[in-house]
């Protein structure tokens, strides 16, 4: 198959971008950029043209013409291959992020060591991009938004991204249809970490046989929260401007609860129940009783281990149970708010305590704290504790787990922290054997209080390194180390599927926001939802301890 013009132009543009990225001769990469721009207007197949003919095209010089001929014959040209060989593949994807050109990508690469879109997204979430000269908060947010959009195009979405649109959609329907019922079923009903499709169950008969014209009328009445959804009659699906896809099922009012139960649960849950529609007893609780089974809250209806290790609804963690906020970053490292601002906001939320856990000295990309800065922060915390009593700020650190499993401070420094969150931030491409050696060594370190985001995953962006979760949890149980449920909705790490095993082993789990600004505390809502899916009990949630209980917990560990 012949090379088309678009492919040739794309190759020339890539060369121009990579040449600028690597700071080659500016005259040369500008010539390629100009040539590519002008060639976009050419309709005649470029692969048919000789070099002499190409030179007649405005903006096409000898080097560009030679590259076109070479590419048309071989689907490659030497100059581009040379640059590709010295360019991390992730940088090419970064060049495709809206708002980023070669110069900015180079600055991010050189200053922060970031060479993938996934790492760039994480850096924006942690307010690290603003550390690079020329990048302000507005630019950082625009890049974050652009990356979010590109991820959304993959067809799967974080629960946190979908939730506000889903909730506003139902509220708008309530205004239009009055007393009808509308509930999202499936993954959304179970509050899954990732949503692929929204499925709405409704009693509004207007949706039966609805056409695009009828939907337009309903949307006009419901306002922008409905108008953002476009109905495609050919597929029977609604599509949101942000990329979400939704199907709608209509049922009679009398059948709504029964259908919600069946559609809200995963197939595996219904199979474990041996459930048939004839088993419906008029409500969920009576249906479980009739089957001789304990009631299971909607979020746990996954067919995992909800019947093997049942947890009473009253024992599951709730957001209102949380008394403290652990694992938070301030302006000492890569956070947006000061220690005092973080503390005051935690107090406003009704929390009893806060743990400041800024990045440690190895994390140069995040302005990790050298020892003198640690001691400076200690002094500030002590002063604030006198002013804010009975609220208490604990002196913590998020200490990097080095490649050999050591933490990155000497014991005499580690011993001065109230708590230490041990986390992996570098060399993530590990085998399971290496990852286990590294994490087990950190867990066995007597100064480790909490194992932070155990797998290092970023949902929909980066797979976590492989672990034997049961062995990790066993080690935590043996060493009195708690496990973090990182509540950042892009992490939710530890995965909910392993929480029940932690409960069996008596391992405390801490729902931590990993907040880089005070508003990040609210991410704990997503941590609680994920915890509930795994059967996280209030009694084994570390930051559900009140202040006195938490102080006693830390004191006991230090003995």
Task: Tell me the role of every PLM-derived stretch.
Residues 12-19:
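Non-transmembrane amphipathic alpha-helical segments
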Residues 159, 331-332:
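Short acidic-aromatic active-site loops that bind/stabilize oxyanions
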């Amino acid at each position: 198959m012949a090379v088309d013009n678009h492919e040739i132009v794309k190759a020339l543009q890539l060369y121009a971008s990579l040449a600028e990225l690597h700071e080659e001769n500016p005259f040369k990469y500008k010539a390629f950029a100009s040539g590519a721009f002008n060639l976009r207007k050419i309709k005649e197949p470029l692969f048919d043209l000789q070099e002499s003919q190409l030179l007649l095209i405005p903006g096409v010089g000898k080097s560009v013409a030679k590259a076109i001929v070479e590419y048309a014959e071989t689907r490659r040209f030497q100059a581009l291959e040379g640059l590709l060989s010295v360019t991390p593949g992730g940088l090419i994807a970064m060049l495709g992020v809206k708002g980023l050109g070669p110069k900015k990508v180079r600055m991010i690469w050189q200053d922060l060591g970031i060479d993938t879109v996934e790492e760039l997204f994480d850096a924006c979430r942690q307010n690290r991009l603003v550390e690079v000269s020329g990048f302000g908060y507005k630019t950082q947010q625009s890049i974050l938004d652009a990356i979010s959009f590109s991820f959304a195009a993959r067809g799967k979405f974080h629960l946190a991204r979908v939730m506000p649109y889903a909730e506003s959609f139902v509220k708008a329907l309530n205004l239009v249809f009055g007393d009808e019922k509308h509930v999202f079923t499936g993954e959304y009903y179970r509050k899954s970490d990732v949503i692929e499709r929204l499925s709405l169950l409704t009693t509004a008969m207007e949706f039966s046989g609805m056409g695009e014209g009828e939907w337009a009328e309903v949307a006009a009445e419901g306002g922008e929260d409905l108008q953002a959804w476009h109905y495609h009659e050919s597929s029977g699906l609604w599509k949101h401007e942000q990329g979400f896809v939704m199907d709608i099922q209509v049922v009679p009012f009398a059948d709504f609860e029964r259908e919600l139960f069946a559609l809200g649960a995963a197939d595996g849950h219904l199979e474990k129940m041996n459930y048939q529609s004839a088993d419906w007893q008029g409500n969920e609780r009576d249906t479980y009783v009739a089957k001789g089974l304990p009631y299971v809250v909607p979020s746990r209806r996954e067919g995992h281990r909800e019947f093997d290790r049942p947890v009473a609804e009253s024992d599951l963690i709730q957001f209102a149970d949380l008394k403290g906020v652990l694992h938070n970053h301030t302006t000492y490292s890569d956070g947006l708010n000061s220690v005092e601002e973080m503390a005051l906001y935690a107090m406003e939320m009704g929390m009893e305590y806060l743990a400041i856990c800024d990045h440690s000295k190895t994390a140069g990309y995040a302005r990790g704290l050298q020892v003198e800065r640690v001691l400076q922060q200690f002094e500030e915390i002590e002063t604030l504790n006198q002013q804010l009593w009975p609220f208490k700020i604990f002196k913590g650190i998020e200490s990097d787990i080095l490649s050999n499993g050591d933490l990155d401070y000497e014991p005499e420094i580690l011993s001065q922290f109230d708590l230490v969150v041990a986390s992996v931030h570098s060399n993530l491409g590990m085998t399971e054997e290496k990852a286990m050696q590294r994490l087990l060594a950190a867990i066995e370190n007597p100064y480790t209080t909490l194992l932070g985001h155990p797998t290092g995953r970023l949902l929909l962006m980066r797979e976590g390194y492989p672990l034997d979760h049961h062995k990790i949890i066993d080690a935590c149980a043996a060493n009195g180390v708690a496990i973090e449920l990182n509540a950042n909705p892009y992490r939710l790490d530890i995965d909910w599927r392993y929480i029940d095993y932690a409960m069996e082993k008596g391992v405390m789990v801490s729902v931590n926001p990993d907040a880089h600004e005070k508003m990040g505390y609210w991410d704990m809502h997503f941590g609680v939802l994920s915890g509930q899916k795994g059967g996280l009990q209030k009694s084994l949630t570390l930051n559900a301890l009140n202040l006195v209980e938490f102080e006693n917990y830390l004191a006991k560990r230090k003995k």
